[in-house]
Amino acid sequence: RSWYYMEIFTDPSNENVVYVLNAPVLKSIDKGKTFQPISVPHGDNHHLWINPLNPKNMINSNDGGANITFNGGESWTRQDQQPTAQFYRVITDNKVPYHVYGGQQDNSAIGIASRTNGRGITWKDWYSVAGCESAYLAFDPNNPETVFGGCYQGIIDRWSRSTAASKSIKEYPELNLGNVPKDFKYRFNWNAPIISSPHDRSVIYHAGNVVFKTLDGGINWEVISPDLTRNDKAHQGPGGGPYTNEAAGGENYNTLMYLTESPHEKGVLWAGSDDGLVHLTRDGGINWSNVTPKELPEAIVNSIEVSPHDPAAAYITVMAYKFNNLKPMVYKTSDYGVSWVKRVSGIDDQTVVRVVREDKEVEGLLYAGTEAGLYISFNGGVFWQKIQLNLPIVPINDLTIQDNDLIAATAGRSFWILDDLGAF
């Protein structure tokens, strides 16, 4: 997986010592002539910090988090000694205390209580749910007995809390490992959207390059949209290049990245693709309109937020970092996508914005999760300012609001909760 592993490090005090990071960690003591694996707590290794004053002290980052050694890799800290999970999305239920759910890289999709009666939240408060590492999760927040969760290649499971049993309910039961996307029946993003309807929680939507709908827990699925992507066959070849096909689906392109249903109007669905398109249906999928902002480049539509105060208003966040463009892109519509205005003033010019959420109580009070922390706007995005507080400077992949708390899903520092948004 040459696109996934690409880091080589040398010991700053010994030019003969070289580390190559891959699924394992490889070490050479003869300038790369020979290599031997060194034991690390987790696979899929991506980065290594070597203390220039003491090269036996290193930090390894990997798909499971981060680990520290003080003896040159003979032993490492455990994976569960610090909150270094990497979450894709976040969703909550309405329990008291509410539980927070998300899919975390390499360590399964989980739920966790937001508060405990003990001495802090620990691993005893975590439990696995449906799906896998890349999961979107969906359920009835008032009764999260049944959880729907995703995995790569469009896999989707239905999990029962009372039995802890899962059942695969994929629309078209195929696993495309080793095939190329242009030959797939349906194309799914690594992080394929799954949502439940806020108007009828028995209705579940799942998005690939089209939108699927089920009324019976995934026994039967209906396609309710055409292909809502650019469907460019030239970009649907083998992932990772012709010699090292990535296979698992991390490079699938021309897929839907985000799907949401209006909390105000049943059947009003917004869909965003990873190739820069925004579509809207106002009749449950019978008719779809392309409402993409005219200036939008080919890029990832990572989130769509329908205003909780105005059914015609929505915010989208767009990421073009795969095109070496790190500029923030936030757009607002007040007329169901007929027109859009850009809303990025105050955000650092080279800071990708991943998600925007609007406060449920105060209209125009917005929160933006970016590649380098949190921003806030008090006027509908006309101007933004940083609000980092004690939150680590870390990518924020998703945000949600529950019981007047702001919950952040981060890439590298797990979940964080900002209590009592009423202070704003």
PLM regions and their residue ranges:
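Beta-propeller blade termini and top-face loops
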Residues: 1-424
